[in-house]
């Protein structure tokens, strides 16, 4: 087995993972030419407004495995997801872990331009800068403004006009791979996001109670079918308030 000299690190919520993530990763790989790329779903992003991702850690990990399955020399790491519960994912800890695991490798960290601009807010950002080379994704050459004190490599990201929030409401084949969409549908991911927009608040609260009760019953009589019970409970009244124009 050849020695790993260059590692590209790509972390994020991946909630859900979409083609923008895949294309950005491919662009960075083409630029850096790493021996290994490591995709790292994070547990709780410190600089995001929400404390928890909508999908579970396990589901986001599984979606990443599906989305990046066709890419060679790539691993999906659960390192950050295995950290203490309710603790933010700090990149510097991941860097420390990877340096111990691959002591002879040079590390490259892929970040978006927005994250690059607030990089000084990252926990122990100076440590990170001393141990990795930043690979900064930009949407066009006019946005490039890399500081001289940061050893950074610009890479042009493809333009994907979609947000993860929109995809949580409605998965879209144009922006997501079919295996990921199938996984979302089969496992009832983002069901609450979806259902909330299809019914009144009264009906939605009723639906949540039914789903909770269905899960409680399933845990008692059919523990392996708890997720299916939840999905059935969430969607049992989905068409209740539909009319002829819905």
Region spans (language model):
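Alpha-helical phosphate/pyrophosphate-handling elements in metalloenzyme active cores
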Residues: 200-228
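Generic structural concept
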Residues: 92, 211, 232-235
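Divalent metal-dependent catalytic cores for phosphoryl transfer on phosphate-bearing substrates
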Residues: 197, 219-246
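Active-site flanking loop/helix segments enriched in acidic
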Residues: 191-209, 241, 245-246
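Histidine-centered divalent metal-coordination motifs
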Residues: 18-21, 206, 236
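Nucleotidyltransferase catalytic core that binds NTPs
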Residues: 1-195
């Amino acid at each position: 087995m050849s020695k790993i000299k260059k590692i590209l690190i790509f972390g994020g919520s991946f909630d859900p993972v979409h083609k923008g993530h895949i294309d950005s990763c491919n662009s960075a790989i083409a630029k850096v030419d790493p021996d290994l790329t490591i995709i790292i779903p994070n547990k709780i992003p410190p600089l995001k407004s929400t404390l928890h991702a909508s999908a579970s850690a396990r589901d986001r990990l599984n979606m990443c495995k599906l989305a990046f399955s066709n890419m060679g020399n790539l691993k999906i790491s659960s390192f950050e997801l295995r950290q203490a519960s309710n603790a933010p994912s700090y990149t510097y800890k991941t860097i420390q872990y990877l340096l111990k695991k691959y002591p002879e490798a040079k590390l490259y960290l892929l970040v978006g331009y927005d994250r690059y601009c607030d990089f000084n807010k990252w926990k122990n950002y100076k440590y990170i800068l001393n141990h990795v080379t930043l690979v900064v994704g930009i949407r066009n050459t006019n946005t490039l403004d890399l500081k001289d004190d940061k050893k950074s490599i610009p890479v042009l990201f493809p333009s994907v006009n979609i947000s993860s929030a929109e995809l949580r409401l409605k998965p879209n084949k144009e922006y997501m791979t079919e295996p990921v969409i199938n996984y979302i549908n089969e496992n009832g991911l983002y069901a609450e996001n979806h259902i909330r927009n299809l019914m009144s608040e009264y009906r939605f609260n009723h639906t949540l109670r039914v789903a909770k009760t269905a899960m409680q019953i399933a845990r008692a009589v059919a523990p392996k079918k708890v997720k299916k019970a939840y999905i059935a409970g969430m969607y049992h009244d989905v068409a209740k308030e539909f009319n002829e124009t819905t």
